[in-house]
Amino acid sequence: EVEGLSMLEPYGAGNPKPVFSLSGVTVTCMSDVGGGRHLKMRASRDGRTVDMIFFSMTRAKSGLNVGDRADVAFYPQINDYRGSRTVQLHLVDLRPSYTAQQVSEQALYRKFARGEAISPYEARQMIPQREEFAAVWRYLASHSGDVTEIPVSLARKIAKENDLWESTLRTMVCLEVLESFGLMTIQKGEGGTLHIRLRKRREGGKLAFYQSPIIQRLQTIAWGEGG
């Protein structure tokens, strides 16, 4: 099937190379190659695995990690190595693949961050439990206090390691509150990545998370002034 595409050659301005897409592939392996200038990865979907290469892209710039779901645009090519012919996808675009819920959660967080009105129900969905704050802190501390992730990937990993319900929305609120306490810095990078760096370790006692202006604002929206 891939070889049949050669019938469309020669490519050019009047006959561009055909580009295809796949949605919701799961990244199973990824590494930088070519002196760290290009990204080589392997992904699977529906029980099938395929190799991919993306020139002038790196793992860090992609914003993805092993286990993440992605959408890819590509043109296929055949590698012939020592008599073995395999299909490899030459990527031209790569981005995280989000579920409808993840898209909705990120939209709600951005809405709140812009200071726009949200409903009491939405506010209640955004307020983290104390164990969620602790889980976020433990994850960051266990990774040397220096993490670069897309929010969805970060939320998934934190939930998995701590046996919690995954919520990109509340993970983002936790990060914002912790940053407001001066415990970390957060820089936004390419592909929606967050570069998070802890500034200092907690030293005994419990942080008053619910005294944070961010949480108090959410509580007021959720339950009123006496909430």
Regions found by a protein language model. Give the residues of each.
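Acidic, two-metal ion nucleic-acid-processing modules in DNA metabolism proteins
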Residues: 1-227
